[in-house]
């Protein structure tokens, strides 16, 4: 895969933009001989409404004190009339070599055969080691069940029933695409679009792909 090593800093992370053919990605995926799921967030389509996050909260019974998913509104430029925002999805990246898995003392944090990083609730002892180890800070301790929770692509609530993650179905702007990483839809999108991946130190390769986009929002008169 060809890529432009143009980087910018979002917090303490590194962003690398990729362009061109995704054929090498497809080849690597086939060599693994595993079904790997991936998600695409098209920031050029996202309007920052957070309908996806609200749908996630309802479907997965996320308490008010926790969050599996949110869309951060990052101001880029600002003037008297309008602000330019970058709408950035904050959720588990299902990264390879995930530090949350490495630190879990009971094996409750694990990766399934589809590449989804999950939490086995019956094995979680609520020690919060995984929460502290996650560089993206996208895990939380459920105050009711006392177990760690995070985005798992709706593995039990939706995928097991043959439905895509609720955030994908709920998005009014069709800014989210989900499927097998080697599927024609995902591969075609990666071939046809310039995208990036956001990776923090200490974490492996993410399985969340992003198309960069910014939006000018006019300020209302007060």
Curated annotation (Swiss-Prot):
Residue ranges occupied by any 4Fe-4S ferredoxin-type domain in the UniProt entry: 37-67, 83-114, 115-144
Domain of life (superkingdom): Bacteria
Keywords of the record: 4Fe-4S, Iron, Iron-sulfur, Metal-binding, Repeat, Signal
Gene Ontology CC annotation, any one: outer membrane-bounded periplasmic space
InterPro entries assigned: 4Fe4S_Fe-S-bd (IPR017896), 4Fe4S_Fe_S_CS (IPR017900), ET_IronSulfur_Cluster-Binding (IPR050954)
Sections of the chain in a coiled coil: none
Induction field: Up-regulated by the oxygen-responsive transcription factor FNR under anaerobic conditions. Repressed in the presence of nitrate or nitrite via the two-component systems NarXL and NarPQ, respectively.
Pfam families the UniProt entry points to: Fer4_11 (PF13247)
PTM annotation, UniProt: Exported by the Tat system. The position of the signal peptide cleavage has not been experimentally proven. Can also be exported by the Sec system.
Binding of [4Fe-4S] cluster 2, residues: 56, 151, 154, 167
Entry-linked Gene3D superfamilies: 3.30.70.20
Sites where the protein binds [4Fe-4S] cluster 3: 92, 95, 100, 134
Binding of [4Fe-4S] cluster 4, residues: 104, 124, 127, 130
Residues at which [4Fe-4S] cluster 1 binds: 46, 49, 52, 171
Extent of the signal sequence: 1-27
Gene Ontology MF terms: 4 iron, 4 sulfur cluster binding; metal ion binding
Identification of the protein by name: Uncharacterized ferredoxin-like protein YdhX
């Amino acid at each position: 895969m060809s890529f432009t090593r143009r980087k910018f800093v979002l917090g303490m992370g590194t962003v690398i933009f990729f362009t061109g053919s995704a054929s090498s990605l497809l080849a690597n995926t086939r060599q693994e001989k595993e079904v790997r799921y991936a998600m695409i967030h098209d920031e050029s389509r996202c309007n920052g409404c957070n309908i996806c996050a609200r749908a996630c909260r309802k479907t997965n019974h996320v308490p008010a004190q926790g969050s599996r998913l949110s869309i951060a509104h990052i101001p880029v430029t600002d003037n008297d009339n309008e602000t330019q925002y970058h709408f950035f999805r904050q959720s588990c990246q299902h990264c390879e070599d995930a530090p949350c898995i490495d630190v879990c003392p009971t094996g409750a944090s694990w990766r399934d055969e589809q590449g989804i990083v999950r939490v086995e609730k019956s094995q979680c002892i609520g020690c919060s080691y995984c929460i502290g180890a996650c560089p993206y800070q996208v895990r939380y301790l459920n105050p009711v069940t006392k177990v760690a929770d995070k985005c798992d692509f709706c593995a039990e609530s939706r995928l097991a029933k043959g439905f895509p993650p609720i955030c994908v179905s709920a998005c009014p702007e069709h800014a989210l695409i989900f499927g097998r990483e080697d599927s024609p839809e995902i591969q075609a999108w990666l071939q046809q679009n310039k995208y990036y991946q956001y990776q923090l130190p200490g974490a492996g390769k993410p399985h969340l792909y992003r198309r960069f986009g910014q939006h000018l929002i006019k300020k209302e008169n007060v």
